[in-house]
Every structure is written in C-alpha cells, then in structure tokens.
C-alpha cells in the first residue's frame, strides 16, 4: 500500500490501531513532549492532538515512534522487509550489467521501478489551497512545540528543507531543525557537510551577496519524509527515490515565490530566502544525545509566503535521550543499511546501530572472518563507505557466531576475544558530530575500533580458546524428557 499524502497514512494508522486522537486540550509548550515521550517509551501509537492550547491547528506527533510504523509508511508490515529497500539502494549505487539473458530478466522489476523516478508536476496542488503573504505571514500562529524547559524558543523539527545548488541538476531535501526567531524568521541549523549547506555554499560562491531561495515543507507524505533521511545516492533526488519506494511518481508543484518544486500534498509550505549576511545565535536546545547543546551562529531563513491545505495538520516531534523518534527511525533504517554494506563487503553477516547509542554513534558488525586483520579492514570501510557513518565514534567487530544485536553476546566477545592494546584502533582528528561536547574540539575528535573477533595465526602467539558447546544429541534427549522432569518452563536458548 502506498500513501500519496499524510492524511491517507493517518487514516491507515487509525484503522489499524496505530494512532490515537487526543481531544483533551494539550499545550505545545512542554506538555506535548511529556505525553509523546511517555507513549513512545511504552511503544504506543502515533498521537493527533486535536485541541492544542492556543491554536486550532491539530498537531501530529510520534508518527514514526516504532520501527513498525516506519515500515508501514513504506508499505511493509515488518521492519525486516526494509532490507528490500536497502537492496534497491545498493543496486542504484552500483548497478551491475546483466550477466546473461536470465539475469537480465531477473533485473526487470528494478528497471520497472526506475521508470517511476521522475517527479510529476501538478497544478492546483492541495498545499496551495490557502496562500498567505505580507503581513499575513505569522509563524507564531503555528502550534510549534517548545519541547524542553531549557530550550530557548519553539522549534520546527519535521520540516523538509528544499534547496538547489547552482551546480546540481537535482534538488536536495534535508531535515534541519529551525528555531523560531520572529513572526517571519527561523534559524536554519544545517551543518557544513549537509546537502542544504553545501548547496548554499555553492550559491554564495557563484552569486555573492544574493538572496538564496529556500522552501520548507511540513507534513509531506510519509514516503517523501523517509526519502529525506535515507542514504540516497548523491546524484539522485529524494523525490525520485520516493517515487521508487511508492511505486508511482511523486507529485510536486512549483513554489509561488521561486522555481523550487515542493511536495504537492504537503500540509504546510514555508517559502522564502536566506540572506548570506544574516546570521543569528541558535540554541540551546535539548537534543537526541539527552543533553542541551552549545549555541552557535547559523543562517536566518526569512519566510515571505506561507501556503497550506484547508484544515492543515502540523507535524512535529521532539528529540531527547534515547529512545526518541529519531532513535526509532534509526532502528528501522538499520535494516536498509545492511544490504548496502554487504554489497561492498560481502563478508558482513549483520550490522547493528544500538538505539541507546544515539542512533549512529556506535555500530556493531558481525563478519565471516577470512584472514588476519580482516576486522580492521571492515571497520575502516564502515567509517568511510557511507556519509551516515562519518560521526560513528565506536565500531565493534565480532565473529559470525556472535549475535551483534545481543549485548550479552557482544560483551562476552569483547571480554574474551580482545586484548585492549592489540585489538583497539584509535584514530585522532576525525569528523565528529558538532553536538558531541565530549570531543576536545567542536566537530573534530577521535574514533575507536574494537576487534572482538577470534584471533588467527599472525595476530597472536597463544593457543586460542575453543568455545564450550553442548553435544547436540544430548540437547535433543533433554528436550524430549523435559516435561517429565517436573521443572518449570525451560529457559529460552
């Protein structure tokens, strides 16, 4: 099942018991965060606050609060099925020519999907049913959440920021938090390596001093939203990838004030520009690390037009100590990363980003070890292969007999198969998340790799231990007589 807009997905979730309407008045100032946080930690439903205090516009929260709902947004019922998306991405990153007629036939489904890539331009788009300009532009009339007590101001969290660089054929979609600064101004917090910031940098170099057109879409269809957080090849538009996932082209329309294309079924569109000379101090805000971050200067986004659907819905979230919504997205996207990594490194058995590691700061990888030093090759490859792992501080490599998603297994491997000096790799002066205050310099810090695999000849002079494993025939014999032993339920092994 595919969803052309956010409303159809809301209806689908509600019909399947995955969305709860809240009619009781709830304040966007702190109260929504507390409710959404409790519900998410209980693995509860998405929430539609129908009566936000001080506003008539409903607020949608906790939309992707479980990996299951992320899968549902992409037409899947099980998060493991998201590996199909990863296989598609792996193919797009490095398409292989058919090895023969049968192989060509097997690739036809992927080629058919590729035909759905170009977005479809439409007129009379739902997102432009209501148009506000001039003095009618007032961001304070949106029910923007103020998430945490120490936050400096309300924060736009789920906006899809749409940009285009002068050297790029495709548009870029990215999700960057935006601090409410004034009735018509937001602070655009994008880091230097992100797509929007790179487009802006190229524009400033080619057109110094000129205003840079920017559009922000709120409440886009779920597939387009997820396309913006997926490791799409640099040469491909997120709109095109969303069309691939949906199985039909993404509807877009031209913005009113510039040539950028916006998701046609979005709930709200903010149009405007960034003046390269206008910067403002952003923060502090509570973030996905579980801490308030430092303040810094970022560009100011001036909003000149607001368009929206009739009876628009405001899509919002909060970020905090895991688990939060970004952490749940990370759990689901984990399944997409596995086939992409395996394409480059077939020896990888599994890959895990533990949500308590703030989604990406730690990775555990199990491999089919084939030679001495193999673990170090894989950890170096993981750090460099995808931009998403640029900020991963810790990588642990284990053997295929270790479940990399089970901390009991992983800790056992670390404590029995590692020598701290020999098997630890330290790399200094590497890119680190700006929000990581533990690093000695903002944006620059170290990384640690841990080789928790069995050591081969050449890696150790010692006789290596043999794991204790019970005789399989004995295990089967005990299984057959267990009920006769009068012992309570057998532990799950």
Curated annotation (Swiss-Prot):
Cofactor note: Binds 1 prenylated FMN per subunit.
Cofactor: prenylated FMN; Mn(2+)
Annotated EC: 4.1.1.98
Substrates-to-products reaction catalysed: a 4-hydroxy-3-(all-trans-polyprenyl)benzoate + H(+) = a 2-(all-trans-polyprenyl)phenol + CO2
InterPro entries per UniProt: UbiD, UbiD-like_C, UbiD-like_N, UbiD_bacteria, UbiD_Rift_dom
Record: active site: 287 (proton donor)
Gene3D superfamilies named among the record's database cross-references: Single helix bin, UbiD C-terminal domain-like
Pathway as given in its UniProt record: Cofactor biosynthesis; ubiquinone biosynthesis
Enzyme class (EC, first level): lyase
GO CC aspect terms: cytosol; plasma membrane
Signal sequence segment: none
Molecular function in Gene Ontology: 3-octaprenyl-4-hydroxybenzoate carboxy-lyase activity; metal ion binding
Domain of life where this protein originates: Bacteria
Keyword Ribonucleoprotein: no
Pfam families registered for this protein in UniProt: UbiD (PF01977), UbiD_C (PF20696), UbiD_N (PF20695)
Keywords: Cell membrane, Decarboxylase, Flavoprotein, FMN, Lyase, Manganese, Membrane, Metal-binding, Ubiquinone biosynthesis
BP-aspect Gene Ontology terms: ubiquinone biosynthetic process
Location (main, coarse): membrane
Membrane topology: Peripheral membrane protein
Residue sites binding prenylated FMN per the record: 175-177, 189-191, 194-195
Subcellular location: Cell membrane
Complex formation: Homohexamer.
Family of this protein: Belongs to the UbiD family.
Stated role: Catalyzes the decarboxylation of 3-octaprenyl-4-hydroxy benzoate to 2-octaprenylphenol, an intermediate step in ubiquinone biosynthesis.
Protein name (database record): 3-octaprenyl-4-hydroxybenzoate carboxy-lyase
Organism annotation: Shewanella sediminis (strain HAW-EB3)
Gene behind the chain: ubiD
